[in-house]
């Protein structure tokens, strides 16, 4: 409700604010965006998505692995000496080294679809971050205006107390001259007490609103926290029709963009699941060599002479995997349907908020006009009442 009220007020009034002292609305919003925990979490999620994009980008490159091993053996073994088979105790050791690589050639278009999905997920995460900033900005604007509203109410209540005291003093003087009854004096005195009680209540409301705002922007302590005294210029402007606002919001609202990116990404998610239906082709190669202490040759000669090379292709053809791939595709399609429903729901929610804000703005405009008329009438009534007791 507060959100709609803020949007409505902003739609009716073009407010030019010049800060005199304390925190301005812009400063409150900037501070909250920098320190709000939810926004910082959303920013980290966006960074994680960026890392995922980088990972998917280089998935087609070959991998390269090196390995080295050293082993020792002790025990009895059978050897042939001449025509005899004998068992002797021996100790030996061996060394091996290798370098291998593997290159994906065809993966059923899994790699390009994973890269496309990662980029869309990054865009969605960035849109989520913008939505978090929008939400905190609206909440702070609402709390900021509530502080100013309560502050103004308190000033009005203090003015009412002074006015009641003046009326009480005037009636008391008239009573001394016999021109006012004791009942009128008692009534004026009671009005002073009632207005003083109202002033205390409005002061409490102002302090609580200020505390809420300081907590919302993540201030460590509310001590010394105050708002800038704004110089406000109000200009009534024609309201933009809600349908026109809605069409503009569809292309700019972060929540809509995030839902659209996720729906688009679900198409690639289906293709990733379908890639398991296709054969997988890869190329591999390796280089290796080894040394055996049981061979009567030095280390360098053996490492050179035992050097081996290998290259080959590997083709994997899926035949039957207990319907796992089929069910993954079904799950991906259901997820796509959910993302489509989520987008529709986000659009409906946006249109509802715009309609509510538009009617709130219309009511605010009417209330402002009638309040101005009532204020002028009250001033005229006050002048007449003052003349009555003078």
Each model region followed by its residue ranges:
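Bacterial Sec-pathway N-terminal export signals of envelope proteins
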Residues: 19-69, 75, 221, 227-264, ...
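Short flexible linkers and secondary-structure junctions
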Residues: 20-143, 281, 285, 323-326
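Small/polar, glycine/serine/threonine/aspartate-rich low-complexity segments that form flexible
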Residues: 67-103, 230-238, 271, 284-317
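Periplasmic alpha-helical coiled-coil/stalk elements that build and connect Gram-negative outer-membrane
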Residues: 51, 133-248, 360, 364
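Amphipathic alpha-helical coiled-coil segments
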Residues: 41-56, 132, 136-155, 209, ...
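Membrane-embedded beta-strand positions in outer-membrane beta-barrel channels/transporters
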Residues: 98-100, 144, 246, 312-314, ...
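Bacterial Sec-dependent N-terminal signal peptides
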Residues: 1-25, 36
